[in-house]
């Protein structure tokens, strides 16, 4: 008889975008996901131990976290997800969690100016008691009295110090987006058109910087900028997914330049 949530996670059942080796042990860290889905977040132990190499064991990670040296969106948290800002005041480092073109989590280093805000996708716009309007964001935030022009699927620019909306991006054709789900996760491009299907999912057609077009669901698209310029810096590759032939040519060119050097 099951009694509540499972308290353990086998390493073979962990999400692939965590990039854990199968022979590293029997278990993987069980995320304390909070408002997020457990498969869409990344435990801080994997960041400090596996990515940044600031700790060797789980106990060392716990001692670092208990000293409150790691901030997520300016606060103490133990799990992060897409677009969250990880700050380490002791080392003056700031990171933003993004996807690479293969759908894996990428810890992208950012400057201090960029670490003061984050982009949040609007899930819904509702009215509470006494007709007070509020919006729900993808990371579980509830913000009252938003701009009346903000609608569902738009993106807001949130100041992490004041928790107030400083600007917003409409979900319109011509704006740059990042795909956060499906087989095209991590790709960045501009919205070309929207296809509405009654009784089914709305399809979004996106074109990347190289001219390749692809389609995905409306729920998998996250607007990150107005026009073709994103409001946040992107990791290496700028969200452009190469084909198998293009990757082979790139490796050959790199090998030739290394041989001639």
Curated annotation (Swiss-Prot):
Gene3D superfamilies listed in its UniProt record:
2.30.30.30, 2.40.50.740, RNA-binding S4 domain
Name the PROSITE patterns on file. Answer: RIBOSOMAL_S4E
Q: Which UniProt keywords apply?
A: Cytoplasm, Ribonucleoprotein, Ribosomal protein, RNA-binding, rRNA-binding
Primary localisation category? cytoplasm
Record flagged with keyword Transit peptide? no
Its cellular-component GO annotations read: cytosolic small ribosomal subunit
- Tell me the protein's name: Small ribosomal subunit protein eS4
